[in-house]
């Protein structure tokens, strides 16, 4: 056990899907997995282990922001032997060609957080996903006939940022989506020799203020989860 995870040794699979919301972790486990067991519940940050098409997989929430997700990712990797983490979450779009309900595979993650600079001796760290995991996710999406966008995310420290001009810079540099965790998870995975990927559904458009309805969000979210889960099976076969 750790200060933040009360699961016994061996409770987690080697692959963990991580949404921000612990109740979303519960939903994923109950909807997509079989033989589900709740393995941790410290601070109501719920974690579950079950099987998907016979493959053992775990689901656990990571909270909001890089500090929170970094704690859980680090402890899962170093204390529970987790080898791969797939963050599954929502993001906002700043580009007119990236629409609400699009699914984004985060090949890299820029950030205004200083966490990776602290970790990397005050140098810039290129926070990138594992290529094989990203490729498997693209293959899973194609097999389902689902279009995905692949490219850079921006992991922001502030949800309510006063620097709205930064959205223009993000658009200029081709940022596909804005969220709050990918760069941190990629940094932790690199530091501890694990692998990570972020898959996001665009839930809001920052420019147009368009938002998904609850029903639309759920349907698109389910597509994203199936892509993530099927990508694990594809990765196993590679």
Curated annotation (Swiss-Prot):
It holds the Pfam family PNP_UDP_1. Catalyzes the reversible phosphorolytic breakdown of the N-glycosidic bond in the beta-(deoxy)ribonucleoside molecules, with the formation of the corresponding free purine bases and pentose-1-phosphate. It is an enzyme of class 2 (transferase). The record marks 217 as: Important for catalytic activity. One of its GO terms (molecular function) is purine-nucleoside phosphorylase activity. GO terms for cellular component: cytosol. It comes from Haemophilus influenzae (strain PittEE). Homohexamer; trimer of homodimers. Keywords: Glycosyltransferase, Transferase. InterPro entries: DeoD-type, Nucleoside_phosphorylase_CS, Nucleoside_phosphorylase_d, Nucleoside_phosphorylase_sf. NCBIfam families: deoD, PRK05819.1, PRK13374.1. CDD domains: PNP_EcPNPI-like (cd09006). The active site is at residue 204. Its EC number is 2.4.2.1. A purine D-ribonucleoside binds at residues 4, 179-181, 203-204. Phosphate binds at residues 20, 24, 43, 87-90. It catalyses: a purine D-ribonucleoside + phosphate = a purine nucleobase + alpha-D-ribose 1-phosphate; a purine 2'-deoxy-D-ribonucleoside + phosphate = a purine nucleobase + 2-deoxy-alpha-D-ribose 1-phosphate. GO terms for biological process: purine nucleoside catabolic process. This is Purine nucleoside phosphorylase DeoD-type. Belongs to the PNP/UDP phosphorylase family.
